Amino acid sequence: MIGAGFALAQAVDPRIQQYDKGPATINVSGYPAAAQQDYAVFTQKCSQCHKLSRPINSDFALPDEWSRYVHRMMSKPGSGVDSSSGLKIYDFLVYDSSVRKKAMVDAKLAKASPAEKAAAEAKIKQVHDKYGHQ
C-alpha cells in the first residue's frame, strides 16, 4: 500500500509539484469584502482535493485559464464545487490574478491576439465591477 502511494506521488507532474511547494495562503485583507468572502469559498472548497498552494502558485492568470481550471474541478466526482461556488471561485481567482499576478497577466495579454486581449480585459473588468474595485 505504501508503495502504491509512493508511485502515485511520483506520477504528479513536476510543474504541479513546484506549485505545491509555494505559499498556501493569500493576504486578502486589502481586497474588497466580496472578494474576501469568495476567497473563503475558494479555501474551503479547493482544499478538499488539493493543496491551496497549487492554484495560488500556478501559472494560470487569464480568465479563460481559470474558467477551464474551475470547470475541470467542478467535473471531478466528490469535489463539492457546484455552479454557484464555482463562479465565486472563478471570480476570486480572476480578481486575485489581476492584482497579485498583474505582471503575468500583462505578459500573457501582450502575446494574445487583439480579440483575445479585449475579451480577457472585459472579463477582468466585469469581476472588478462585481467587487466594486476599479
Task: Give names to the regions the model predicted.
Residues M1, L62-E65:
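Short, solvent-exposed linear motifs at loop/edge-of-secondary-structure regions
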Residues Q10-A33, T43, S83-Q134:
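Flexible coil segments in periplasmic/lumen-exposed cytochrome c-class electron-transfer proteins
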Residues A33-A61, S79, D96-K101:
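Periplasmic/extracellular electron-transfer cofactor-ligation site
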Residues I2-A9:
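Sec/Tat signal peptide C-region and signal peptidase I cleavage site
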Residues A40-L52, S67-H71, S75-K76, L87-D91:
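C-type cytochrome heme c attachment motif
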Residues G5, S75, S98-K102:
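A generic secondary-structure boundary signal that marks alpha-helix termini
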